[in-house]
């Protein structure tokens, strides 16, 4: 019992530390903020990150300019990346290893006041437009996991002709 309660204590301490730090994304990759949908109209609590490095390996020399960008949308349940971005062998790591420029959609724990699903899709569409512009009009691959998969499907329908292939993993 002592070990069980000590584990719960450590977990709570980790969560409190994470909250004090402002609940930053817990990606296992270095990144920079590309866009924050909180500043869009309509606003949502989603952000777009560009993955810059894997460990100490800079990506400038290993990205293939002929490959389309990849936008990964992870599940909306909880906070932080799921299968997509917390290990080098994740979707992010594998796409980077293959030379694709990778972007990752994250979100803050609380939605914007009055936020709706159409607001989220509108923000995601602006992310697609922005990334397409930054990559000479190339349509990004949309990669969605679980709830992120149905968001990717809705987004692809809204971005007809602007988005590339859609990969839906474990999506309802």
Give the label of every model feature segment:
Residues 1-33, 40:
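N-terminal targeting or regulatory segments adjacent to alpha/beta-hydrolase or S9 domains
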Residues 39, 46, 50, 106, ...:
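Catalytic domains of lipid- and phosphate-ester/thioester hydrolases
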Residues 60-62, 132-135:
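A structural boundary/capping signal
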Residues 143-152:
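Gly/Ala-rich beta-loop-alpha elbow adjacent to hydrolase catalytic centers
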Residues 161-172:
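A conserved short beta-strand
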């Amino acid at each position: 019992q002592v070990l069980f309660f000590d584990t719960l204590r450590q977990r709570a301490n980790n969560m409190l530390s994470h909250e004090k730090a402002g609940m930053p994304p817990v990606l296992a990759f270095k990144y920079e903020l590309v866009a924050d949908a909180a500043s869009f109209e309509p606003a949502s609590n989603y952000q777009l990150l560009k993955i810059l490095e894997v460990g100490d390996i800079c990506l400038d020399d290993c990205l293939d300019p002929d490959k389309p960008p990849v936008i990964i949308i992870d599940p909306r349940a909880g906070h932080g990346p799921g299968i997509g971005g917390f290990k080098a062998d994740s979707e992010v790591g594998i796409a980077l290893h293959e030379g694709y420029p990778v972007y990752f959609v994250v979100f803050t724990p609380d939605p914007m006041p009055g936020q709706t699903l159409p607001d989220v899709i509108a923000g995601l569409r602006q992310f697609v437009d922005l990334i397409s512009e930054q990559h000479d009009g190339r349509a990004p691959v949309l990669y969605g996991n679980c709830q992120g998969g149905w968001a990717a499907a809705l987004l692809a329908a809204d971005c007809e002709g602007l988005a590339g292939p859609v990969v839906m993993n474990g999506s309802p």
